[in-house]
Amino acid sequence: KEYAMGDRMRPVPFEELIDRIFSEYRNHGTIFGIHKEDFYKTNPKHSITVFGQKCAVPLGPAAGPHTQLAQNIVSAYMVGGRFMELKTVQIMDHLEIAKPCIDARDEGHNVEWSTEYTLEKAYDEYLKAYFVLHLIQAAFTGKVEEPDFIFNMSVGYNLEGIKQPKMQTYIDSMIDANKSPLFKQYKTSLKNIIEEGNLLEGTDLEGNEKALKALENRISANICPSVTISTMHGCPPKEIEAICSYMLTEKKLNTFVKLNPTLLGYDKVRSILDETGFDHVGLKRESFEHDLQYSDAIAMLHRLVELAKKQNLGFGVKLTNTLGNINDGIVLPGEEKYMSGRALLPISTTVASLLSEEFDGKLPVSYSGGCTVFSVKDLFDTGIRPITMATDMLKPGGYARMAQMAQILDKESLTWDKKDIDAKAVKALSEKAKTAEYSQKAFRGDNQAKVDEELPMFDCYISPCMQACPIHQNIPDYVGLVGDGHYAEALSVIYEGNALPNITCNICDHQCQFHCARMDYE
């Protein structure tokens, strides 16, 4: 029997959110379950700018499951995420999303689109996160500084919907939060919390209280000076251009427009997927024919670049959107699903290569298309920035996977000051991505850690290694105790379920190794 994925998100009130964060850190050294050993500390010598805004780390969560709730955004920040592409909003904000809606066993597939919250609730989540990140930055650095992060709103899917009053209220309140009563309310709440004087008590942050003084007055009402435009697969070129023009001329927003992998054409995309072993991904030629064509895209982008210059604003592309493909119906509902994750890397970088060559590296590229620990430095060194991700953080390790990438860029990359994109480097990366071991389907293989047995409604978590073991050895408790240095207790766990460990270890065929949740760790 399959139990439905939880489909009720319950927002945490602002004051409770702050109390939860600092109480958990005080008592456990964690924030939303992320241990402080996995927190990323920024290097003051390194930063990038995106349309004039400072961003201490060029990484962040893509619009998706990691930017829907305030606690998700906070979690991403703790591990180095500084470019927050907020989950897409649209006028139809009461959609029933069929569950499950995400399948990330290897490459990702999803059947969800925009936020599952109403526009009002989505705005509230983003505003709460915006305040909390200012608070966390001040508390953890002890310094009075400008924000080291960027909030980028993502908006869809057609101009008619965007012009509706509810959407106008949302967009205008992201540009100037003074238009929302919540902004003043949260400023007052934050002021009261700070003036109580005990927020940092009992933590290793004591002594940083001065940085919190009058923090509420240093929080800009301009939450999002930039936007990423998301359109439907198959959206006409004129509609895409109209939305971008509207954002540039009417809303005065720096703008990224998200483009689809279909720009390469059916034959090229099919060839890349087959070459890398993802031949099970079924494509429809007509989906490519009905989507934005490359020649139309180039003409449109040139016009929008010139329009942005006239408005004294920035304009770039987001590469790439997900890839629509035929749904086999085994995991996800519906006829079509949308692919993300590592299978997109050689496709998205090929699109980036073509556009970088066309615009001589002058067209900014915000990237999201299968970036992993193996490719993040190569991507960044081309001049592509920021780099966002979603599918990779749905793997074991979760948010901490981003911290590892941030550390690699900080320690190994020498291209932090790069202003333009190196078209030749992007082309080389796109070729490498087609043949690199980490891009091949065989790299991950088909091994599954999923437990096949029916799980109960409660206490439904079980380690696949423990279930696969013929004697169901309590491996998680053993590993946990050893990790904490409690060796005698760890040994007693072995004895509890295994009276003859010397014999069983000699006849063991190590089924746990083939059913390990760590198979997705690199």
Predicted feature locations:
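N-terminal capping/small domains of soluble enzymes
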Residues: E2-E250
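Glycine/Thr-rich beta-alpha phosphate-binding loop at enzyme active sites
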Residues: H28-N43, P261-G361, P396-L414
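Conserved, mostly hydrophobic/aromatic
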Residues: P61, V257, V317, L355, ...
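Glycine-rich beta-to-alpha transition loops that act as phosphate-gripper elements at the mouths
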Residues: A63-H66, L323, L363-V376
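Catalytic cores of alpha/beta
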Residues: A70-A76, A242-S245, E357, G370-M389
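Glycine-rich phosphate-binding active-site loops on the catalytic face of alpha/beta enzymes
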Residues: G80-D93, L259-P261, K377-M405
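Ferredoxin-type iron-sulfur electron-transfer modules and their immediate structural context
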Residues: A400, Q404-M405, D410-E522
